[in-house]
Amino acid sequence: MPGQSSPWVEIGSGLDGLGLWQEVTFTVHYQVPEGQQAPNDVNVTVEVAADGEGKNIIQSDRYQLRGRSFIWEIPGNFNRGKAHTLEEIHRDLLARLKSHPTTGKMPRLIPVYGILGGSWHGKRNSNKEFLHLRTETGLLLGRNVWKKDELYPDLEQKYRIPDGKLLAIDVRGVRTAKLEVFLLGLKDKERIRVVSFGDEIGVGGYNLNSSPDNKMFHEYLKAAGLSPSDLGFGEWNQARLVDESEAFKMPKAYYWSRLFGIDKDIEKLAKRTRIVEKILGPGVYTGANFSPHSQFWPRFGQWVRLFRKRGMTMPWSEDYIWQIPELSPQVTGYLLDVLRSAGRIEKMPIHYYTMPHWPGNTPKDLTLSFYSALAHGNKVINYFAAVPIYSYTENYVSWEATETWKAIRDLTHDVGLAEDIIWKGQVRPSQVAILLSHATDIWEAAKGSSIYNFERKNVYYTLRHAQVPLDFITEGDLIDGSASTTRVIYFVGTHLRRAAAEKLRDWVANGGLLFSVAGGGFLDEYNQPMDVLAPVYGVKSQSLTVTEKNLWAKQLFQWLRPLAHFSYPGASSKLPAYIARQDIEPETAIVMGRFDDGKAAVIRNRFGNGLATLVATFPGSAYIHPAIPKRPWDRSTSDDGFAHFLPTDFDQSAKQIIAEPITEAGLANILPVESSNPLVDATVIESPTGIVVALANYSNGFIPDLTVRIRDVGRVRSVIAVRAERLQIARDGEHMSVTLPLEWGDMIVIRR
């Protein structure tokens, strides 16, 4: 009733323990006098007191409510400021963004997802002012994907929204049997570009005791030309699925069980993809976000095989890097280069969540991840989720994170200055590749291990810090000959398909350069000894010891003691051997480095017209180890915290060993892009109309004069950087050098 008030309600225990903003919903309950209608508007006074009796009032505001409820955003500590309504705080955020000029423009070709705007289905009656403010905030940040009924006419005219094929829909809740009818009934079908099949999905499951699964397994084996005896069974009624508990007793059955589970799920997704393509036509891509947690391991079956078999057509992942003790946001490049390999044949566009979460991430690491994603092939921007806390309690950017909100706006508008080249362009192919082995992945998983993925990442970082461009190739690429033009192959694994090992042997004989770490492919896909590569390495015998299963660059690894030390010509000191040691008895190989006990640590062998190097430990891990301080892992939101620490003090002797094949192949002087600071992640993205060189600075500091040399630029009409205003440009025939200041990220845009 008018004039009445509620009792005091204690809220202090619910305030955020970190002192951050959060929302509180106030619902006004009132009794309408008999015979009267409820009013459209209700005037209420909301008071906050420092005591339970209301004697020490610290805030009092009067509001006219449209409906019965409203939301306050309240600080974790009222000494830091007063509470605000959503309208007030949106007005404040808009003012902060408008006071921050941006030189870029909203993208029109590349979709931008994951930014707030439009309708909101929260626990309140959303009034027009709130929705208008929310929508303009999203527009100012660069959101360019809107349904036709989401935009206010004044905002649509002011921001000139593209009306192209940019919409995304999610059909995870639509069964395959009903998917076609569902798609036919959609409005705006012609505007859809992305169809999501789910979030953080997995493939490869099967039920050991399921009669239908085992029956499908039999049909799968028959289609592959296999009989029960090939897998160690007597008759078909004895053939069955096998999991990790029997993997090492029944290795052939286990290997084919894993392939069956993966391919079974791929075909389910492929069926949905075919329906989408039938109804929505060309230019529409299917995908589902893949989580790389917790080892940032792009497992071959899901991350590569699925797309090579067209289960889906848009490789898609997320960073969440600040949650995992990875080396740095440069792991983004590793993930995307694997996804780029997955979609290589059809040039599938990559979709990547670059996450601005605050608290959690920082503007620096957001910028690094964003620019590394662009450099390695990302074509769909998704911030999941650049929204305030009232939208999610897990994925959000807090109101007070002004620098993060600015970074989101800047990054989005940076892309608008180069999107025509990025969308139609491709990362320039490399003559150097890392070989992915599905066989190694399957047997690593059987042991509960991810250690070869750990070393593979470390070899990747080493080569990228040597400014070597990298592609990833597969066992299938070796078998079908599509990897034949690769000059240098790096292999980090234990197992290889026998057919792939034979092709790798022939590739070396024909002039290829092979570099392998401890393991080297002496086991086949059935976990059986294999000597196909022994003459390639020039090895008479070998045995392998691996001491760890799971490590992270910033957790556990920095306290690890070396198993031994070894010498190498030109190294300033002896190098440590971490995690793995392979005892090698050379036959024709030359011993280049020895362990303290005199045994071979690095061998090199001429085989036919090619050359093979085998390092009997993990040299990539030796490269990163001195750069990681012995600090406890944290999840802080400060660039000073260990979660956001950028390592720089790497072992240059280890890099020398790993990068030596690049020099021997004559590639060191013809790298497509080189920068004066090797810790800048840079690639060449090329289209018929120009080149984009995306730069991500992992040197842990501002670079006042970075010189970037780009090969084979061709005819040049204009050169700009999307951020740096001061450029020095020099031509050297077909090549170009650009000198510019670099903080964390930038793009050089060369138009032809």
Located regions from the model:
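Aromatic-Pro/Gly-enriched surface loop or interdomain linker
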Residues: 93, 98-106, 401-485, 518, ...
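Mature N-terminal, pre-catalytic/accessory segment of carbohydrate-active enzymes
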Residues: 1-162, 166, 175-197, 230-235, ...
